[in-house]
Amino acid sequence: MQAVILAGGKGTRLFPLTSRTPKPMVGLFNKPVLEHAINLLKRHDIYDVTITLAHRAEQIIDYFGGGSKWGVNIQYALEDSPMGTAGGLRRLQPMLNDTFVVLSGDAVTDFDLKAATECHKKKSAIATMLLYEVDNPSQFGIVESDNGGKVKRFIEKPRQSEIFTNTINTGIYILDPEVISYIPYEMPYDFSRNLFPRLLENQEPFFCYRAEGYWCDVGSLAQYRNVHFDALTGRVKLNLPARRVANGIWVGDDVEIHPTVKLKAPFYVGNGVRMSRNSSLGRFSVLGDASTVEDDAAITHSVLGAGTSIGRGSQVYGSVLGSGIKVPDGRHLSDEVLVDDGSSDHLRAEISSELMSRHSSVEHAFTWSGLEVARLAAQLTSLRQLAA
């Protein structure tokens, strides 16, 4: 089976995180979001991957190359001008000779793609749209289907009066190669606005599949922050690049945590992190690789990129800090996004408290000392050495 990943978006709603980075390359636990998508494909034995590119394409090509590091074969299709979500597939027709999956390189999901593909083939579908239940469907496409799952009607971004379901189109599709014949050459073309209406008009076998698991399109700064929190609680299954030493606790290698440090799960501490005397790491906090937290500093409900530094006595709450940000001593940050642009002020944005309520408390949340966490990490290392 083959896959096409759409990775040409600019990600304007994620500014300033996307000021120098294409949206699919924004970090999620020290890996680009796009890398998590590739890992998902590999878990489902999909090794032949084509990535469509536009904005800052060179960053993606330089990072992933031919895909050998991830055990997949990656090809690239560069769009000189915007081709819409479906327009770029026409160029790929010669290489797409079997059922293939289309997904977005800036969404996070753990859907069972094998189950969706089996459903697609069982129904002899030409196209299958994966659906997911959300609280507010107004920003997505909604679908009406018959009892057998065949799509009858599709409404993109419905008005409030048009909403009849909270199950939405995720932008993940299982397609047969024949569907490409509906896409014109070298023209912008969209799945929702153009292709799907044509399939309905021609009464093609176009089905939907209600997927189980997790999906988020990472369409806002608040959603970006909360995807991290969802991973810490296990709502989404990701391959995190650190050791899980206890429930809700991930710790990387070469970590220095002073015995007086207080840590409250769930949290993630990357490789080479250093936490100094009497500092604290509250619930739902992520420390990127090589971050430092000085004496008496406190962090909670925040995501810190690699190489960040939190000064003595500073407090960071509900914030996202890009790689390399240095917070001076005694500062207080709340619901802010900071990205290094080479200036002393950095690029800044406010981040809403959207979705924070579901992460305000955790069942069985314990406070750990730095000494206890260090012991857990050491024990796990010893067990792995014995197993080897």
Annotate each predicted stretch with a short phrase.
Residues 50-54, 130-131, 303, 320:
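Short internal beta-strands
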Residues 243-375:
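Structural signal for interior beta-strand "rungs" in well-ordered beta-sheet cores
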Residues 25, 142-145, 196, 208:
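A structural signal for short hydrophobic beta-strand segments in well-ordered beta-sheet cores
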Residues 61-62, 67-147:
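Conserved beta-loop-beta/alpha segment of the NTase-like Rossmann-fold superfamily
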Residues 100-101, 108, 114-121, 135-137, ...:
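Catalytic-core segments of class I nucleotidyltransferases/pyrophosphorylases
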Residues 1-61, 72, 388:
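N-terminal glycine-rich phosphate-binding loop and ensuing alpha1 helix
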Residues 13, 59-62, 91, 112, ...:
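Phosphate- and divalent-cation-binding pockets in alpha/beta enzyme and binding domains
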